[in-house]
Amino acid sequence: MDLWQLLLTLALAGSSDAFSGRETTAAVLSRVSQSLLSVNPGLKTNSSKEPKFTKCRSPELETFSCRWTDAVHHGLKSPGPIQLFYTRRNTQEGTQEWKECPDYVSAGENSCYFNSSFTSIWIPYCIKLTSNGGTVDEKCFSVDQIVQPDPPIALNWTLLNISLTGVHADIQVRWEAPPNADIQKGWMVLEYELQYKEVNETQWKMMDPILSTSVPLYSLRVDKEYEVRVRSRQRKSENYGEFSEVLYVKLPQMSQFTCEEDFYYPWLLIIIFGISGLTVMLFVFLFSKQQRIKMLILPPVPVPKIKGIDPDLLKEGKLEEVNTILAIHDSYKPEFHSDDSWVEFIELDIEDPDEKTEGLDTDRLLSSDHEKSRSNLGVKDGDSGRTSCYEPDMLETDFNANDIHDGTSEVVQPQRLKGEADLLCLDQKNQNNSPYHDACPAIHQPSVIQAEKNKPQPLLIDGAESTHQAAHIQLSNPSSLANIDFYAQVSDITPAGSVVLSPGQKNNGGMSQWDMHPEVVSLCQANFIMDNAYFCEADAKKCIPVTPHIKVESHTEPSFNQEDIYITTESLTTTARRPGTAEHVPGSEMPVPDYTSIHIVQSPQGLILNATALPLPDKEFLSSCGYVAQTN
């Protein structure tokens, strides 16, 4: 440096005679100095540079060393000696004593080495540099903070596998820990960082820190050469040590073809051509199936087609011509569905509870006060009646037939009953020649009733005036009370919709018990004519005559069980007839017809029943209450 300054001074002194004035000399000197600084930046105008600490490190956490820079002095005067002093910050010692560096040689030039005797791991240190009696630099630290391990040694690699294409390969890199680091005893725990790159590259690829001394490298090119290096640091520390020596990795070429370039699949071209092909196929399919797809997406509106009718007539709205064509052809007449079965329902009037007891069939048969009302023939539009399911034309036909039947029955029935009674009496008089013809007037009315019952034609209940007369005749003669049929309950409903009633009892000929006990007859008649539908058990027992002196083997006394307290009027009538029949031998047994089904519902208060040819066997009905029910 001094030589350059001397040459510069001589040059300036020699050129001072060529230039006049100080200003010119100063300008020349500044230009020369800038030229020299551009050539050699180390030539500065400052006279000196103070020494500084560069770093302090402990490679194995047992010893440490510190280094500093050399002092630079550009003046003519040489710098003084550089000394290092240290002290420990011990809290037990009251004063701090500065001591000079124990070894300036072991760690090299411009360094101080502290062996294990002067090293304390958990005690902080303070160091300073002095020159010519003054402090140049100062620093404080602890040994565990300056740990920087030595580089790992013995790096090598192992081939793991090569890809099927022979382009890439995987390797395993191994190394050993620094020899001076006590890893086996656990005095130090090191973390390793591996870096690798291709030979021609400048940027290193770093891997995550690991605790093991081996790491795999994947997908390395076979035709490339790689550089690998490793460094370490104390765990939980930020200061890495020096890098190890560089390991060069050259992978062998296993395949016969050269791997100068990567073999890439043309995925982009494959995708483009694939989409194009699918689009073309879709358009071809749509074009070939155009009509069918149109039918599926937009189905045509069906045109009304009738055989023998031009569809244009329907489109133009000429309905009169269409109706004319339909009227000509009988095949186009509307067909009624005959498969639908009509169900007949009995009208029930549940508005007034008192009317239920007044409209019983038995009371209508026995009562003469009930007169037919023409106003009852009106149709009641209810959900439970016939009007809810019958057609209006059918309804008018039924009512017209009922009106004609009611009108004729009022005039013809009395004459028919009287004529048949006369014929019956005359027949008995001619055959028997007995004095019974005197009693014909007495039995005239019951015979007429039996003859009328034996006819298979339907019986009109509460529909004509003759029925009321027959009921009045029966009430005038007590012996005819047993011939009355009591329809106790509905037993079944046929599939056709008819209602089947429970059967009645047979009428045994001969003298009845009513003739033997007239007071019982009058009492029972009074009880039966009662408007109430229920009568007491005690009254029912009064109707049964007591015959203690007559013993008949086939006779069985009726018993009223305490559990079955209800008895029916049929059982009561049968019980009242049996004492007489046991005492007298029956002369003839005439069956009383049982009207077991409803023929026509004439009006809300009238029923026409069907008569059966043969009587059904007797049935015993057990009831379970203390009142006798007189039902329809």
From Swiss-Prot:
Disulfide bonds: 56-66, 101-112, 126-140
GO MF terms, alphabetically ordered: cytokine receptor activity
Positions annotated with a glycan in the UniProt record: 46, 115, 156, 161, 200
Record's GO cellular component terms: external side of plasma membrane; extracellular region
Phosphoserine modifications at: 341
Keyword Membrane appears in the UniProt entry: yes
Source species, domain of life: Eukaryota
InterPro entries: FN3_dom (IPR003961), FN3_sf (IPR036116), GHBP (IPR025871), Growth/epo_recpt_lig-bind (IPR015152), Ig-like_fold (IPR013783), Long_hematopoietin_rcpt_CS (IPR003528)
Transmembrane annotation, as ranges: 265-288
Changes after translation: The soluble form (GHBP) is produced by phorbol ester-promoted proteolytic cleavage at the cell surface (shedding) by ADAM17/TACE. Shedding is inhibited by growth hormone (GH) binding to the receptor probably due to a conformational change in GHR rendering the receptor inaccessible to ADAM17. On GH binding, phosphorylated on tyrosine residues in the cytoplasmic domain by JAK2.
Residues in compartment: Extracellular: 19-264
Motif UbE motif, residue numbers: 340-349
Segments forming domain Fibronectin type-III: 151-254
The protein's role, per its UniProt record: Receptor for pituitary gland growth hormone (GH1) involved in regulating postnatal body growth. On ligand binding, couples to the JAK2/STAT5 pathway.
Matches recorded under PANTHER family: CYTOKINE RECEPTOR (PTHR23037), INTERLEUKIN 5 RECEPTOR SUBUNIT ALPHA (PTHR23037:SF46)
Protein name: Growth hormone receptor
Organism annotation: Saimiri boliviensis boliviensis
